[in-house]
């Protein structure tokens, strides 16, 4: 019986490389998968899942008007699993489409992404994944500044100063965001 999985973690917790590992495991057994990623993620190139260790793979980009269910249903070869990177950028409608893939097409769906933004607010996609997922798993990483578990994401400006207000979505990597614990989110030991 297929299920909807949500695997979340702070920045740098290995979400993208986990997608590539899962895809490889299926494909080694001659079981095709379908990989999607947000069309908003332009850090590397639109339509790619890229990990910080240098591995990358083509993926179907999701835009606001993308109907993920229709795309999967129209595939000539049914995938054994659907993998979604950057699930936090999805809309409620997208998440409902993922649930429909599981419930109607009986295909497992694994969504990977951030749970909360730099203000410690839920992303829309993450909120609805938390509500609709059958299984939820935290992917752990350590705080950039201390030894505690990172549960938040700290955004910094060009001078390295922490930012706590602004637009929720700003695409960036290690130069813009740090995985941090709660204490270091409030009082980051940054030298400016």
Swiss-Prot record:
Keyword annotations: ATP-binding, Cytoplasm, DNA synthesis, Kinase, Metal-binding, Nucleotide-binding, Transferase, Zinc
Catalytic machinery residues: 86
SUPFAM superfamilies in alphabetical order: Glucocorticoid receptor-like (DNA-binding domain), P-loop containing nucleoside triphosphate hydrolases
Family annotation (InterPro entries): P-loop_NTPase (IPR027417), Thymidine_kinase (IPR001267), Thymidine_kinase_CS (IPR020633)
Binding site for Zn(2+): 143, 146, 181, 184
Pfam family, one: TK
Subcellular location: Cytoplasm
One GO-annotated biological process of the protein: DNA biosynthetic process
Top-level EC class as recorded in UniProt: transferase
PROSITE patterns: TK_CELLULAR_TYPE
Known catalytic reactions: thymidine + ATP = dTMP + ADP + H(+)
Family per similarity comment: Belongs to the thymidine kinase family.
Listed NCBIfam families: PRK04296.1-4, PRK04296.1-5
Quaternary structure note: Homotetramer.
Protein name, entry field: Thymidine kinase
Gene assigned in the entry: tdk
